[in-house]
């Protein structure tokens, strides 16, 4: 049975939480000042899951793909910048995720779409349409379909999204949903089987492993005062290497990312806290912000409001986020 949902957001935590409810997980930091606006459309005719998403401010995220899903993604505007695990999503290219892929992504103000399908359905469709089963690649990589084939994918994906938003009752028809789904699966299989793979330099995945070690260390130590030497030791990388990789994968220095990450975790805690039982001081110090005056000034500069105002706000999403914000739920 088909279903769809379209939502808009002004809170990045609520936006990432909504993505996390659709066979993926993402969380991270907004990397620039300004008013955050985002939207997320989720459409599932039956087995295929489509996501249409966009945000107005640059972001750096750490995301994971549901291990049960074979997923691809593409940008919808060639002028924007998107990097997936350090790979630039160039115009008219498709990112094909390995099973249970996870890594850092960075976005300019941008829009992206994704198509996901259970692995067994992709294998079956491959056998039916091209005479061989298709499986997820061992490593996430980019492919470049022919311009007509890529255009076909984009237009079909867009048509399904527009129909789901404007006339969901039409897509609710089993016959209509099945027709769209079969067309989507067919063009997805064509892209996977007929496109040219974009070569990735061999050291790239060693660099991804360095960044994963860094993220794991930061996740395990949210309330510690950390220094660059700590980050280098945890990532098993030299100062120079870590700085270079952070600029490639995160778009910023390691210390800037650490600071932004802690600021966003503090903001998340303020958003879900009970103002009658919790103080700004308690939350700030729990994330190793010991100079409260500097914290308040930096917080207001980054988020456009003092931390006390955030504490008084009701959560945008009524479902509180529990557990680690950087891990895919079981």
Task: Kindly give the residue locations of the regions a language model identified.
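Conserved short histidine dyad/triad with adjacent acidic residue
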Residues: 33-36, 44, 48-65
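Short hydrophobic/aromatic patch on the recognition helix
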Residues: 242, 246, 294-295, 299
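C-terminal flanking helix
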Residues: 250, 258, 262-267, 300-303
